[in-house]
Structure formats: C-alpha cells, structure tokens
Amino acid sequence: MEDYLKQFVEETSFYNRLVLGTFMPESWWGPLPHMLQGWLRNYIGGVLLYFISGFLWCFYIYHLKRNVYIPKDAIPSNKAMLLQISVAMKAMPWYCALPSLSEYMIENGWTKCFARISDVGWLSYVIYAAIYLVIVEFGIYWMHMELHDIKPLYKYLHATHHIYNKQNTLSPFAGLAFHPLDGILQAVPHVVALLLVPMHFSTHIALIFLEALWTANIHDCIHGKVFPVMGAGYHTIHHRTYRHNYGHYTIWMDWMFGTLRDPVEEDAKKM
C-alpha cells in the first residue's frame, strides 16, 4: 500500500516542480514542507487562473462583443469589478487550503482515490467520475441552500457574495468573491465524495480548479440556453430572488426539490 501511495506524492511533487519551479528558484520553495509546497502551488495556480480567465472573459464580452451579449448600460463598473477582485484575493489563500488538505488525505490513504486510469479501466473511470459528480452536485445544492436558510450562515458568510444582485453588479470576477469559509463550505462536497467513491486523483484536482472557470461562467449574466446546464441565466435569477436555482452544474437538483425557475419563462412573463 505504501508503494501505491508514493505515486500520489510523486505526482504532487511533479506539479510542485512544474509550477513553483517556473516562478521562483528552488532554494525558495524546496526547503518548505511538502504540504506547504502544495498550498503555494495551488495558490499561484488559483490566482493565475482567476485573473487570466477573468480578464479574457471580461475583455471579450464587455469590449470585443460590446452590446452583443450584455447591453451597454448593464456592464458592471470597474469599481464593482475591483471590489469583487479584492474580496476574492482576500479569500484565495484560504480557498487553497482545501485542495491542499485533500491532497494530504489522498497521499496518506484516507480516501478511495486511484492514481492511474489503468488501475480501474476506462469504463469504471467514467462510472466513478459520474457518481462523484452526482455527489458533488447534491452536496453543493444543499450546502448552498443551507447558507441561505440558516440565518447566521447567511448573515455572516453568504451575504458577502449576495451584495452583487443585479446584472450591472455581476461579472466573471464575482465568481470567487465569497467569504473564505463560504467558498470552502461550498467546495467541501468535492472532498467528501473522495471518501465515498473511487476517483482518479488528477481528475479530482482538475475539477476543483475547474470551479474557478465555472463560477466565472455563471456570473457573466449570459444565458447560454444549453439544457440541462445551470448556466448564468439561471444563476442570475438566484442572485435576484435568493430562493431559486441553488444548483451547480445542472438544473437537476432544483427540478427535483422544487426550487427551479427558468430564465426563458421569466423573460416571457416580462413581455
């Protein structure tokens, strides 16, 4: 078993060398404990992903496609976006503690993770990944709902994110603009799922970082109309009503539990 777990350590060490070695001499990060190296790598990767994706996204929809996707008077101000960036950057060091913790758990054999797809085969890999995503979808839905329904959680945690409740205050940069504990709680299902279902290690890490892109997507206020995806059209309604569309990747949970509100139907009512 110890030899098998070494594969995870070797993989995270490779990621550390790849990221940290690109931005600083090894004498700076080499002496750090392995877990702290992982946190620093996750932090650098998270910051880069947030800014690169956010700036490219905003440049495209607010400038290159000005008045195509977003009406001119609905484009958020620079002040609003800078506030979102400030909130996200204060939370980022704390966000990165979660993937660092999950890596530690995996490296120590506390989870059901496997290192190589060949360990289980492609069919099992796809089935396990699908079950993992269902658990994540279910967990995030209920965590998100409780952050609204439990008044102290909303007041002291989730309200930080819901100051952005109109189209002209929402932007891709709002995607990670949470109280640190709020952001961590909503990502916890990714770690809980590792205890319940076998999951490919690299896919797990990739899905956690995909959250940064996904949350940017659902805060751009552009309804993609891709069924059954819980896109920005649905999430914008959530920011307006606070009582609908708690789901994450799909509309499945909201449909099952009666909290779904369709943006197409909403637009039809306004006409």
Swiss-Prot record:
TM region positions: 44-64, 120-140, 190-210
Catalytic reaction list: a Delta(7)-sterol + 2 Fe(II)-[cytochrome b5] + O2 + 2 H(+) = a Delta(5),Delta(7)-sterol + 2 Fe(III)-[cytochrome b5] + 2 H2O
Topology class, membrane: Multi-pass membrane protein
Keywords on record: Endoplasmic reticulum, Iron, Lipid biosynthesis, Lipid metabolism, Membrane, Oxidoreductase, Steroid biosynthesis, Steroid metabolism, Sterol biosynthesis, Sterol metabolism, Transmembrane, Transmembrane helix
Keyword Oxidoreductase listed: yes
Names of required cofactors: Fe cation
A Gene Ontology biological process term: sterol biosynthetic process
Annotated compartments: Endoplasmic reticulum membrane
An example molecular function term from Gene Ontology annotations: delta7-sterol 5(6)-desaturase activity
EC numbers: 1.14.19.20
Motif (Histidine box-1): 144-148
Record flagged with keyword Lipid biosynthesis: yes
GO CC terms in record: endoplasmic reticulum membrane
Motif placement: Histidine box-3: 235-239
InterPro entries reported in the protein's UniProt record: Fatty_acid_hydroxylase (IPR006694), Sterol_Desaturase_Related (IPR050307)
Motif (Histidine box-2): 158-162
Domain Fatty acid hydroxylase: 130-259
Role: Involved in the biosynthesis of sitosterol and campesterol.
Written domain comment of the UniProt record: The histidine box domains may contain the active site and/or be involved in metal ion binding.
Family annotation (PANTHER family): STEROL DESATURASE
Family to which this protein belongs: Belongs to the sterol desaturase family.
Protein name: Delta(7)-sterol-C5(6)-desaturase
Organism: Nicotiana tabacum (Common tobacco)
